[in-house]
Amino acid sequence: MDDQNKNLILATALSFLVILVWFLLFPPEEPVTDPNAPTQITQSGETADVALTPPAAVTEAAPGAAPQTAATPTENAPRVQIDTPALEGSISLLGGRIDDLSLRNYNETLEPDSPIVRLLSPVDAPGAYYALYGWAPAGTLSFDDVPGANTLWTVESGDTLTVDTPVVLRWENGNGLIFRRTLAVDDDFMFTVTQSVENTTETDKRMQPYGIIARHGEPDTINFFVLHEGVVAMADGSLIESDYDDMLDYDFVEREGARAEVEQIEQNGWIGFTDKNWMTTLIPTPGQPFTSVAKYVGNADIYQTETRLPTQTVPGGQTVTVETRLFAGAKEWEAIRGYERELGIEGFIDSIDWGWFYFLTKPIFFVLHELNLLIGNMGVAIIVLTLLIKALLLPLAWKSYVSMARMKELQPEMEKLKEKAGDDRQKLQVAMMELYKKEKVNPAAGCLPILLQIPIFFSLYKVIFVTIELRHAPFFGPFQDLSAPDPTSIMNLFGLLPFASPEPGSILALIFIGILPLLLGISMWLQQKLNPAPTDPTQAMIFAWLPWVFMFMLGTFASGLIVYWIANNVITFAQQYFIMRRHGYKPDLFGNIVASFKKKKPSEDK
């Protein structure tokens, strides 16, 4: 391998190292609220302790009408239980809020007594997070004539919401309007919300149906720039994402009474909040135009998303019904893809944060997912995926390793050219290029597989980091969560000594690495030894340290990523060794290892 080739490899490795350091040392800063920002006011003029309901649908709403915003305790409100294979919780009859929801199949940690993940919480609980439906008044109606956040509903039918038994809620306004809300749920995470209004009067009534998802206070987020957390929406084919700190910078919209972004959707769309693994989304019927709203209510510190359907006219003596959906659950690829296909929810699969390299992350995840279903072990699936990637890149790798072998054959001639050129670098470069051209050798060909590995590495990193299928995915022995760092540590001899490993994220955990990062460093070091050390002393020193620097830098990354990197190094080693031997160059692995431990004499460095 000549100096140009080594310089390119070194530059690539160092650039990769800089990116890793940036990942570790420079996460985004916590958002800071501007103390000089204008105070937001609710439509009622009071502090809003519950979601800010939409304004009147049209300007001719009854004078003095105001949405319900005053807080009402929910802990004593009657409830209807939710009981499905995937979900458990309850619906508060106060406002008909879906505000108590937990995910049966997901625990917070791997501990045996770990509680299941709670997704939604009522207003009087820490981190309140809930879905709310209602009607905004239009025409001659006031907010007292329509159900809102604090309306007390009664159960018309259904004692428990299950997959087979929907629940019907009922409320009469006392002025001839009867409102019903039918809630149904499937085996996974999709609710169907059907709102109807029966007009028993003789005059037409007008009102606008809406749905709201509200979060009180900024939730605990990972706050890492490779992951989106916050508003996620689809607007007629365009994906819209806003972090929580972005919402603080929305323009103040007078009609909304808050900082808000309002989008008019013509045919297909949805909006909600996404976390790393969980999501809540309001989904109008595909083909239905609606208004999509994301807002931040500053004086109450409430983040919310809304969908507002077109204003409905309910003729006297008739009933009008509208249907929407609510997704509330885990971002499982199979479930989300199924909803996109079966329900026609455009772009729903893009609610998973595939990142800039989506053209790589999507197929990589698909193959990894299918392999895991086939094999039944995510760690083994990652190794098989690595084999498939290396097989796909084999034609390029073959050419590059053949080129490297040819470079070895030309080494004696290159040394002669160096002697002839002396200190004339320009003359040497010209002579080298003529030699390469004559022998049909590309000196940079050896770097191509390395360059291709960078986007693949970051795509796999993205897949492991953001997809829920890797969460708590076991490999073997102590490796029970491939989305988490290696739990073993050299400090207690990988579990042989009777004391715990360092706390993850601590300085000790960075120093006393686990067995997987150690194997990574060794595999990189052995791969280097297929070639003699560079003649340039500076290059030789950097190359000597590079495997061990990567070992410590990658030690805090997800263990699934380290498994991939180790497998990649081992396969690359085998490929390179076999191809180079086949083309006449026999790597002196043992000799290069021995030479790396010998101390050079000063004369050898000159």
From Swiss-Prot:
It is found in: Cell inner membrane. Keywords: Cell inner membrane, Cell membrane, Chaperone, Membrane, Protein transport, Transmembrane, Transmembrane helix, Transport. The chain crosses the membrane at residues 8-28, 378-398, 448-468, 506-526, 542-562. GO terms for biological process: protein insertion into membrane; protein transport. GO terms for molecular function: membrane insertase activity. Residues 59-79 are annotated as: Disordered. It is a multi-pass membrane protein. This is Membrane protein insertase YidC. It comes from Dinoroseobacter shibae (strain DSM 16493 / NCIMB 14021 / DFL 12).
